[in-house]
């Protein structure tokens, strides 16, 4: 149990008043002062914060007032209560590095006692340098509360309280004068103000009428330095000054080169971690220990005529990971987790690029993970470099290890992805990237450059102000969509201009919330975009398949910036629909974890994602063709701050292609980031992800819904699987983006007898007996949690039917065991699933690894074994568990579908049966269950009272089987046997069930598919399923979900 107050701790590593070469350290009762001949800082003994910084006699911070007038200092959004600014008495260290240069370090570590998490800040002054080298460390060790929360924000701030600083500089082309503190401000949305009434403010006259810190956001790819500039008009000596944050390393940031974040306003930021623009955050779980940095706060000065550009260039010379490498090696002993040069190497090589590739870049990042989401491993690192004209690249000082390589370039669709690339020595690597293509390109809109900046109000300069900032940087409400597109978007390929005729945001409606220029929302001609194009007969000749590919630069779903906690909102996953010539329609549900505030926060490059719409080329025609791209009408989100409530997407680019014979017609699209929604209900997918259903027809009154062609669903699944392999997605990604279950009408068009049989049989398959209160035993059933931890209701017996993990690692398994062990249920039964490769002896023998035993704590782990559960009063239940499923892919615990011996070990007196997979045709979407298992149950003399399984996520639910003629007929139909005759039998039995309770004599078995994290078109959130058993009679009673 931790105390309820903050504990201030420090390690005194060496404190003295000394002078080594040009460095001097002094102290008094309240401060330590560290200085060289030009630069000095004062550090408060009470909290370790820098409260004074002086360069050449000029005060850079001003007086201390709260959190102003100090820095760099550290804070975070990381505690259960929210933000925390740590502070503790610091320790000083000193020494001489390998070059003979002296240094002094200030180390502050503070512990948040109620959670036992720590923040540490390390600041070093070296020799005659006029700046501070900064590292930050976060730890969380707390076995009693394994998961604390996400690390929402972590940042260091240089926060002056002085009028010295006259200008901001975000990047080389984005700078301007600071707004005056006296300027009248009108709040127009969260963190955004209108200053235009004060026309003599230099910011207003030169840069913009609106101010928000998001205007000064920069993308990490080319970013080197940002900060404050003083033009000399406010300095004591008339000289110019600069305060800069230098990105000399970027390996410990997240999100790769596509990440963008705040850099400067009245504060010089170092945003180490944030959720801005949909960026993911790492989770603080027991054992989290990560050091970020180094970065370098540099302070410089020049004569009265020195320009901002000159001081900026002086700081930018340090933006190299090779700068000061010897120094960082020397102080590594003071910096936990920092890897010195002995553990680093140079990653170099050559890329054979597709023709036409511009601005190619190579990225090293967390293995087997999209670099935009590289927060899952606490030691995740990232590096990137531009690829030159010859295809060569060099990345110095890479920590040795195994990485994912990602390559992308302007003008080229898709990505090159290769996992398990070992960076150990300095050997050259060679990669060959072939552009994705499905045939001959018909048309292209936009440039695939990972941003929506080329469209209206994107990168084009705002010529109304002398400094001409890019339009997207300015408050979005300035650009009135109804005025720009009074008739909506109607874009004709070959005639329209992308810079004028497509907006940088595709709204579901144009909002008035957060828009001080409009009192009412505008709905007309907003959510549907129309793209028209002409085709000739020769372009269509001998074509079979068309593919329309869309790449998004960002999307705003109802989930907002939340990544791992799906919101139960209607448009959590955002549907984007393409209608082709009014005769074909397909919907892409944009997953919630790609959502973020992008366009409304002055962004054109956020979470990139893409999708291919594949359809029959026969839907295209000679002459005029029309695509309608639709967001649901009036799709909204709930906003707790003053922000627009309209959902949107922003498109990167689009392309259309056709091919002959058996090859496909490819239509690829890259457009501005836009989002759309539709009538949706929630359902839980892998890792607790909430998804949505297909849109209801009434949401799109002008779009018809044709009966799909036979085989269309299989074809789309195949294409999406193929796409996932090309892009190096994880199994999780593929599952999350797989096709939805079709509607009853769609299934009826494809297989009328089977669909009718499913409907009729389903009407009577969930009836349960009325509940009594005598000797009740509650069984709580879950399965396929895949690292998630759903809320579990109270009960007597907890059953987990496998797939506890996603990747099958020991670390993942231990976390799930820890979670299940903490549950209060008397008995906790667990089996493995096909994801638990760590537990499968055969899997390890085939892959050259050795299986290690697990500590199951209070859990009863069954692997083709039984256990007796003593319920008291002479009542017992026998439970048998098996992890095995029919062969499918390369998972664990699999057997050939032709094997008839697997289920012979089930004891005849089994009361509770737990298998990972279902018997075929029962709670078995896609008919992937086991026919042999089903037959084994038929042959048992005394069938189980309860059978719990998972594996088939879309089959979630419960069913009562009575082992009767009705069930025989239904199963025969599902197996394709005498379908018409068995359908008649099924109707006959269904009529009888209207009048008789077929479960009254206890012959029935309750089947439960408890897959909590998914389901193809099952539209309810996955909770545990409960079944009550009357212990004395061993009869099931009504249950709960």
UniProtKB/Swiss-Prot annotation:
EC number(s) reported in the record: 4.2.2.23
Region (Disordered): 703-728
GO BP terms in the entry: cell wall organization; polysaccharide catabolic process
SUPFAM superfamilies documented for this protein: Galactose mutarotase-like, Galactose-binding domain-like, Metallo-dependent phosphatases, Starch-binding domain-like
Superkingdom to which the source organism belongs: Eukaryota
Gene Ontology molecular function: carbohydrate binding; hydrolase activity; rhamnogalacturonan endolyase activity
Family (UniProt): Belongs to the polysaccharide lyase 4 family.
Name the record gives this protein: Probable rhamnogalacturonate lyase C
Organism: Emericella nidulans (strain FGSC A4 / ATCC 38163 / CBS 112.46 / NRRL 194 / M139) (Aspergillus nidulans)
């Amino acid at each position: 149990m931790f105390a309820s107050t903050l504990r201030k701790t420090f390690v005194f590593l060496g404190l003295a008043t000394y002078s080594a070469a040009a460095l001097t350290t002094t102290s008094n009762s309240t401060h330590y002062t560290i200085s060289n001949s030009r630069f000095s800082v004062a550090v408060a003994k009470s909290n370790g914060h820098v409260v004074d910084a002086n360069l050449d006699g000029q005060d850079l911070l001003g007086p201390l007032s709260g959190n102003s007038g100090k820095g760099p200092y550290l804070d975070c959004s990381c505690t259960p209560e929210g933000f925390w600014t740590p502070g503790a008495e610091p320790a000083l260290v000193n020494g001489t590095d390998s070059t003979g240069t002296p240094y002094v370090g200030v180390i502050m570590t503070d512990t948040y006692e109620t959670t036992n998490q720590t923040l540490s800040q390390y600041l070093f002054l070296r020799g005659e340098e006029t700046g501070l080298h900064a590292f930050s460390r976060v730890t969380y060790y707390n076995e009693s509360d394994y998961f604390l929360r996400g690390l929402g924000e972590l940042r260091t701030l240089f926060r002056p309280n002085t009028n010295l600083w006259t200008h901001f500089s975000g990047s080389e082309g984005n700078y301007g004068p600071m707004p005056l503190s006296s300027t009248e401000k009108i709040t127009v949305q969260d963190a955004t103000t209108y200053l235009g009434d004060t026309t003599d403010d230099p910011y207003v006259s030169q840069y913009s009428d609106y101010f928000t810190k998001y205007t000064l956001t920069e993308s990490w790819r080319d970013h080197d330095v940002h900060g404050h500039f003083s033009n000399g008009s406010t300095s004591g000596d008339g000289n110019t000054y600069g305060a800069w944050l230098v990105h000399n390393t970027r390996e410990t940031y997240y999100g790769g080169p596509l990440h963008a974040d705040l850099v400067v306003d009245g504060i010089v930021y170092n945003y180490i971690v944030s959720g801005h623009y949909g960026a993911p955050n790492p989770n603080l779980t027991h054992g989290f220990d990560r050091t970020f940095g180094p970065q370098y706060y540099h302070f410089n000065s020049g004569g009265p005529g020195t320009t901002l550009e000159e001081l900026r260039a002086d700081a930018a010379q340090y933006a190299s990971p090779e700068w000061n490498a010897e120094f960082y090696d020397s102080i590594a002993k003071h910096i936990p987790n920092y890897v010195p040069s002995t553990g680093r190497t140079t990653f170099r090589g050559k890329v054979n690029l597709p023709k036409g590739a511009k601005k190619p870049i190579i990225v090293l990042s967390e293995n087997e993970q999209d670099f935009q989401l590289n927060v899952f491993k606490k030691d995740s690192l990232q590096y990137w470099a531009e690829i030159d004209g010859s295809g060569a690249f060099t990345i110095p000082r890479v920590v040795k290890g195994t990485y994912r390589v990602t390559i992308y370039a302007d003008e080229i669709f898709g990505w090159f992805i290769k996992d398990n690339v070992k960076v150990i020595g300095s050997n050259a690597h060679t990669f060959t990237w072939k552009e994705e293509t499905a045939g001959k390109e018909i048309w292209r809109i936009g440039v695939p450059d990972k941003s929506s900046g080329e469209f209206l109000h994107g990168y084009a300069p705002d010529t109304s102000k002398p400094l001409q900032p890019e339009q997207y940087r300015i408050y979005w409400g300035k650009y009135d969509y109804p005025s720009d597109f009074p008739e909506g978007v109607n874009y004709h390929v070959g005639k329209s201009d992308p810079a004028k005729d497509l907006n940088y945001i595709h709204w579901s409606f144009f909002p008035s919330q957060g828009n001080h220029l409009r009192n009412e929302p505008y709905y007309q001609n907003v959510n549907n975009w129309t793209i028209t194009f002409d085709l000739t007969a020769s372009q269509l000749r001998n074509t079979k398949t068309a593919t329309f590919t869309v790449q998004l630069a960002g999307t705003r779903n109802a989930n907002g910036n939340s990544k791992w906690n799906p919101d139960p909102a209607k448009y959590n996953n955002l549907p984007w629909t393409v209608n082709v010539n009014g005769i074909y329609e397909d919907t892409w549900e944009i997953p919630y974890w790609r959502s973020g505030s992008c366009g409304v926060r002055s962004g054109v490059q956020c979470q990139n994602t893409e999708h291919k719409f594949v359809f029959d080329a026969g839907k295209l025609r000679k002459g005029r063709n029309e695509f309608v791209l639709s967001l649901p009408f009036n799709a909204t989100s709930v906003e707790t701050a003053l922000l627009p409530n309209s959902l949107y997407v922003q498109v990167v680019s689009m392309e259309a292609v056709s091919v002959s014979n058996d090859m496909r017609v490819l239509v690829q699209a890259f457009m501005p980031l836009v989002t759309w929604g539709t009538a949706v209900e929630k359902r839980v997918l892998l890792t607790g992800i909430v998804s949505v259903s297909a849109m209801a027809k009434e949401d799109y009154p002008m779009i018809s819904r044709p009966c799909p062609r036979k085989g269309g669903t299989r074809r789309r699944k195949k294409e999406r699987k193929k796409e996932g392999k090309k892009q190096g997605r994880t199994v999780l990604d593929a599952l999350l983006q797989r096709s939805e279950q079709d509607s009853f009408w769609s299934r009826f068009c494809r297989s009328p007898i089977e669909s009718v049989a499913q409907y009729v049989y389903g009407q009577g398959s969930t009836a349960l007996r009325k509940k009594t209160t005598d000797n009740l035993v509650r069984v709580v059933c879950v399965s396929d949690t895949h690292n998630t931890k759903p809320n579990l209701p109270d009960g007597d017996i907890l059953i987990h039917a496998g797939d506890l993990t996603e990747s099958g690692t020991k670390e993942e398994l231990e976390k799930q065991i820890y979670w299940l062990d903490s549950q209060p249920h008397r008995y906790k039964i667990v089996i493995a699933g096909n994801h638990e490769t760590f537990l499968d002896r055969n899997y390890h023998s085939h892959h050259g690894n050795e299986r290690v035993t697990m500590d199951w704590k209070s859990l009863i782990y069954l692997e083709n074994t039984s256990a007796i559960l003593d319920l008291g009063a002479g009542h017992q239940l026998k439970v048998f568990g098996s992890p095995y499923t029919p062969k499918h892919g390369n998972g664990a615990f699999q057997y050939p579908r032709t094997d008839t011996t697997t289920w012979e070990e089930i004891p005849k007196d089994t009361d509770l049966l737990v298998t990972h997979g279902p018997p075929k045709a029962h709670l078995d979407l896609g008919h992937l269950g086991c026919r042999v298992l089903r037959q084994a149950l038929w042959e048992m003399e005394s069938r189980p009272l309860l059978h719990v399984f998972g594996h088939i996520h879309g089959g979630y639910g419960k069913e009562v089987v009575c082992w009767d003629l009705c069930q025989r007929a239904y199963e025969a139909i599902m197996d394709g046997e005498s379908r018409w005759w068995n359908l008649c039998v099924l109707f006959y039995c269904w009529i009888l069930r209207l009048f008789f309770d077929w479960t009254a004599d206890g012959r029935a078995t309750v089947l439960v598919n408890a897959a909590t994290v998914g389901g193809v078109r099952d539209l309810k959130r996955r909770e545990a399923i409960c079944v009550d058993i009357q212990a004395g009679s061993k009869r099931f009673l009504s249950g709960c979900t």
